[in-house]
UniProtKB/Swiss-Prot annotation:
Reaction catalysed by this enzyme: a plastoquinone + NADH + (n+1) H(+)(in) = a plastoquinol + NAD(+) + n H(+)(out); a plastoquinone + NADPH + (n+1) H(+)(in) = a plastoquinol + NADP(+) + n H(+)(out)
General function of this protein: NDH-1 shuttles electrons from an unknown electron donor, via FMN and iron-sulfur (Fe-S) centers, to quinones in the respiratory and/or the photosynthetic chain. The immediate electron acceptor for the enzyme in this species is believed to be plastoquinone. Couples the redox reaction to proton translocation, and thus conserves the redox energy in a proton gradient. Cyanobacterial NDH-1 also plays a role in inorganic carbon-concentration.
Listed EC numbers: 7.1.1.-
Homology family: Belongs to the complex I 30 kDa subunit family.
Membrane topology note: Peripheral membrane protein
Disulfide bonds: none
Subunit architecture: NDH-1 can be composed of about 15 different subunits; different subcomplexes with different compositions have been identified which probably have different functions.
Name of this chain's protein: NAD(P)H-quinone oxidoreductase subunit J
Protein location: Cellular thylakoid membrane
Protein's gene: ndhJ
GO cellular component: plasma membrane-derived thylakoid membrane
Gene3D superfamilies registered for this protein in UniProt: NADH:ubiquinone oxidoreductase, 30kDa subunit
Length: 175
């Protein structure tokens, strides 16, 4: 036992993320992105820089991802990035298990600006407005980017983890 040498511990296997089929297709066609670990259901997740979102979103639409199932925001915590998330589905006739991919765009908290995908998927309309209203993510090129849930004069972004609730809410009687 004393004669045995200590062997270096190999790097963690999870450090290398295998590329899924969509990521491979994007790479083959020259689109800059990063593969992230798949979610618990096996849905492929890719990270895209804000400047490359529109070209990649357009390419994914042309590749068959014709349905934006979900668009939302994530706050990674005070002082950390905000994330704009897009869950895309390839809908086709007689598809038992449609192909899915999730696109994440990490944005700086101080200036969270990303292009709108409204012109690619019309379902992004109210979803981008909700992400703007709750997280303050600005979707450039959106035709009607204004608050959708909170009053127009509301101050702050209620779903940010560093949001401080006002001490006083003015309630009016219904009669």
């Amino acid at each position: 036992m004393a004669d045995e040498e200590l062997k270096p511990v190999p790097a963690a296997a999870e450090a290398i993320v295998p590329s899924g089929p969509t990521s491979q297709w994007l790479t083959e066609n020259g689109f800059a992105h990063e593969s992230l670990a798949a979610d618990k259901n096996g849905v492929e997740i890719i990270k895209v820089e804000p400047d490359f979102l529109l070209p990649i979103a357009t390419a994914l639409y042309a590749y068959g991802f014709n349905y934006l199932q979900f668009q939302g925001g994530i706050d990674l915590g005070p002082g950390q990035d905000l994330v704009s998330v897009y869950h895309l589905v390839k809908v086709s006739d007689n598809a038992d298990k449609p192909e899915e991919v999730r696109v994440k765009v990490f944005l700086p908290r101080e200036n969270p600006v990303v292009p709108s995908v409204y012109w690619i998927w019309k379902t992004a309309d109210w979803q981008e407005r909700e992400s703007y209203d709750m997280f303050g993510i600005i979707y450039e090129g959106h035709p009607n980017l204004k608050r959708i849930l909170m009053p127009e004069d509301w101050v702050g972004w209620p779903l940010r983890k560093d949001y401080i609730s006002p001490d006083f809410y003015e309630l009016q009687d219904a009669y």
